[in-house]
């Protein structure tokens, strides 16, 4: 996951001077779309009996072969690190008359990494990223919620007709992620503040829908809530790399963003277990209340880092970055 976030964001940062937010959104939306498709395929391969070992083996074999066929040829033959490697400039970059375009003449604007690490808002950005990622971890537990709350009767016995749909909630969430990535990418290209509002509000509304729909077995509300909540997840995949470039520029973007991602993903690893402890202990109600609080804090902390970081950094013409 870390390699996916870092390499895609770093590559697109080099190729797009303008419209970076939109392109990030479209690119990461494909991961959500693929996840949704594979999730629906997987639930039918597994069937109602989720504990049968051979079906899991077949499923992972299918996923592995599909991933190899779809990714390796394009990685080997289609990807180039910099546009200058093939005699081009980044989309939206100005070209001067008589300019020689090559990787040897490449000089990107921005703050050096060592200087960025001394900025207080760099660490607030990490906190914001951690909150974004905690929100993104929530869908990992939605299938458990569905199987233990929605797909069982009053005595706790599984309902086969509902159990076979156990991947649908997470699938709807992944579709929401795909839509949200494009939406947030397009919005942040105009206003990063509006993108933060969009993602946080979607998180709150989505959790409320899943909470109500699951306990009351109202499947349309449940699945729609999953779709809406999926639009929170792009804050970590689409908004975080965009904010990083907005605050620190392109010069040492890869170095800075990689350092940001280390604690962000570390917190995500602990959050997966921590969220499980919440619903296994205090219960699912506490799980959803905490999630709503996280969604709200995503907006609050994200707004703080954008407001003060943008004021401090003017080397890359913030007005241009906001329109990029």
Where are these regions (language model features)?
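Flexible cytoplasmic inter-helical loops of multi-pass small-molecule transporters
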Residues: 80-110, 313-321
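Loop-to-transmembrane helix entry/capping segments in MFS-fold secondary transporters
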Residues: 18-27, 163, 250-260
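Intracellular juxtamembrane helix-capping segments at the cytosolic ends
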Residues: 2-16, 235-248
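C-terminal transmembrane helical hairpin of 12-TM major facilitator-type secondary transporters
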Residues: 173, 190-243
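Helix-to-loop junctions at the C-terminal end of transmembrane segments
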Residues: 179-192, 279-280
């Amino acid at each position: 996951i870390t390699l996916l976030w870092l390499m895609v964001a770093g590559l697109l940062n080099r190729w797009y001077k303008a419209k970076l937010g939109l392109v990030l959104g479209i690119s990461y939306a494909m991961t959500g779309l693929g996840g949704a498709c594979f999730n629906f395929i997987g639930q039918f391969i597994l069937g109602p009996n989720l504990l049968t070992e051979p079906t899991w083996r077949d499923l992972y074999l299918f996923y592995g072969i599909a991933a190899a066929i779809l990714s390796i040829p394009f990685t080997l033959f289609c990807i180039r690190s910099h546009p200058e490697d093939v005699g081009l400039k980044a989309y939206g970059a100005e070209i001067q008359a008589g300019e020689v375009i090559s990787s040897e003449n490449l000089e990107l604007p921005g703050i050096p990494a060592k200087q960025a690490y001394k900025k207080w808002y760099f660490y607030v950005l990490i906190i914001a990223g951690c909150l974004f990622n905690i929100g993104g971890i929530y869908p990992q537990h939605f299938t458990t919620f569905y199987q233990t709350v929605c797909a069982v009767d009053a005595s706790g016995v599984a309902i086969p007709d509902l159990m076979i749909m156990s991947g649908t909630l997470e699938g709807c969430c992944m579709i929401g992620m795909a839509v949200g990535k494009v939406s947030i990418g397009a919005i942040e290209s105009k206003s990063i503040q509006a993108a933060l509002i969009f993602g946080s509000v979607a998180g709150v509304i989505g959790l409320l829908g899943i909470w109500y729909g699951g306990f009351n077995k109202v499947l349309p509300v449940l699945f729609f809530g999953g779709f809406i909540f999926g639009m929170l997840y792009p804050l970590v995949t689409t908004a975080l790399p965009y904010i990083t470039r907005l605050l620190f520029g392109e010069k040492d973007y890869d170095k800075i963003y990689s350092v940001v991602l280390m604690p962000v993903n570390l917190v995500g690893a602990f959050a997966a277990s921590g969220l499980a402890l919440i619903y296994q202990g205090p219960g699912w109600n506490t799980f959803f209340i905490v999630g709503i609080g996280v969604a709200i804090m995503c907006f609050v902390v994200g707004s703080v880092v954008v407001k003060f970081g943008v004021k401090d950094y003017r080397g890359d013409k913030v007005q241009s970055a906001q329109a990029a």
